[in-house]
Amino acid sequence: MNILTDPLKLKTSGCADANASKCAEGDGEGSVQVQLDPNVKIGSAKVFSIYGKGGIGKSTTSSNLSVAFSKLGKRVLQIGCDPKHDSTFTLTKRLIPTVIDVLEEVNFHSEELRPEDFVFEGYNGVMCLEAGGPPAGTGCGGYVVGQTVKLLKEHHLLEDTDVVIFDVLGDVVCGGFAAPLQHSERAMIVAANDFDSIFAANRIAAAIAAKSKNYGVRLGGIIANRSKDTDQIDKFGERTGIRRIAHLPDLDVIRKSRLKKMTLFEMDHTDEILAVQQEYLRLATEMWEAKEPPIEGKPLKDRDIFDLLGFD
C-alpha cells in the first residue's frame, strides 16, 4: 500500500525526511492524515485538481479544459476520480474501464497490465484514465488515487505528459478524496452563482488551505459554471479573497454537448460556442503560465456564509 492513514494524535510515518516536521503538524485538529509514499509522486507535469459540488459540471469543465490545453500543444492526461467513472465520457465517447476494474481482473498484480488496458486516447490526443473507486461503504478513495499514480509511474506514462487534470468526486473533502491535492500545484473549484454551490466551495477552499500546510497545492480560484450572473460568487470573493477566474454561462448547448458525447470543441461553431471555447483557451493559458499568484483566501465559518448569502 502506498498511502498511509494516521490520526493526527499519532506520530506520523511515511513522509519524506525533508517534510517530516511539516507532516507531523497535520492538517488540523481531529484530521486523519492520508500520506503519500514519497516514491509515488508525479514528475515534472503541471497538475491541477478540479473540485466542486456534486452535479455542478466538473466533468464537463475538466474535459473541455483538457481539450483546451491540448489545443495549446500540451500533452494532457485526465484522471477521473469518481466511482461513476464518467469523467472522460465526452473525450472517449464511452465509459472506459477503471483502474480498479482492470486490477481486479489480474488479482491486483499490476505487473500483468499493459498501458492500453487502462489508459485510452480521447479527442485531440487527450489521454484518459478513470481511477474508479472502492465499492460503496468500503475502502478509501485516496488509496485508489495512490494506486493509480503508482501504476502510471510503473509504466512510465507520466514522463511524456505536460498537464495532469484530476476530476474529483463531488464536494467530498475527507482525507481520501483530498488525496489529489497532495499531487497538485493548483486546485480549482467549480461553482454556480447560488448559495448551495458557494457553500460547498467554501468548504472545499478550507480543505485546500489545510492541505497547503504540508503540500505544494494552492487554491487557483473559482470557475463560475452554469451561471448567467456571477454576483453571488463575486460577493463571496470580495469577502474571502477567493477570486473568480472564469465564467462559463448557462447555455443549453453545453448540456447538449454531453448528451451528444462531445466536447464543446467538437460542436458546431456558433457564436455562443466560439465564445465559450475562447474562455476555456484563455483559462488554460493562464493556468499554464501561472502569472497570477496563488490565492491566499480566508474561507468563512458556516454561520458567516449564511449571514453573507443566505438571507437576501
Curated annotation (Swiss-Prot):
Enzyme Commission code(s) on record: 1.3.7.7
Top-level EC class as recorded in UniProt: oxidoreductase
Name of a matching Pfam family: Fer4_NifH
Catalysis: reaction(s): chlorophyllide a + oxidized 2[4Fe-4S]-[ferredoxin] + 2 ADP + 2 phosphate = protochlorophyllide a + reduced 2[4Fe-4S]-[ferredoxin] + 2 ATP + 2 H2O
Gene3D superfamilies (UniProt xref): P-loop containing nucleotide triphosphate hydrolases
Keywords: 4Fe-4S, ATP-binding, Bacteriochlorophyll biosynthesis, Chlorophyll biosynthesis, Iron, Iron-sulfur, Magnesium, Metal-binding, Nucleotide-binding, Oxidoreductase, Photosynthesis
Names of the cofactor(s): [4Fe-4S] cluster
SUPFAM superfamilies for the chain: P-loop containing nucleoside triphosphate hydrolases
GO molecular function, one term: oxidoreductase activity, acting on the CH-CH group of donors, iron-sulfur protein as acceptor
Domain of life of the organism encoding this protein: Bacteria
Entry binding sites for Mg(2+): S59
Pathway info: Porphyrin-containing compound metabolism; bacteriochlorophyll biosynthesis (light-independent)
Residues that, per the record, bind [4Fe-4S] cluster: C140, C174
Record-listed ATP binding positions: G55, I56, G57, K58, S59, T60, K84, N225, R226, P249, D250, L251
Cofactor comment text: Binds 1 [4Fe-4S] cluster per dimer.
GO biological process, one term: photosynthesis, dark reaction
Record bears the keyword Protease: no
Record InterPro entries: NifH/chlL_CS (IPR030655), NifH/frxC (IPR000392), P-loop_NTPase (IPR027417), Protochlorophyllide_ATP-bd (IPR005971)
HAMAP family: ChlL_BchL
Recorded family membership: Belongs to the NifH/BchL/ChlL family.
Cited function: Component of the dark-operative protochlorophyllide reductase (DPOR) that uses Mg-ATP and reduced ferredoxin to reduce ring D of protochlorophyllide (Pchlide) to form chlorophyllide a (Chlide). This reaction is light-independent. The L component serves as a unique electron donor to the NB-component of the complex, and binds Mg-ATP.
Subunit structure: Homodimer. Protochlorophyllide reductase is composed of three subunits; BchL, BchN and BchB.
UniProt protein name: Light-independent protochlorophyllide reductase iron-sulfur ATP-binding protein
Organism, as annotated: Rhodopseudomonas palustris (strain BisB5)
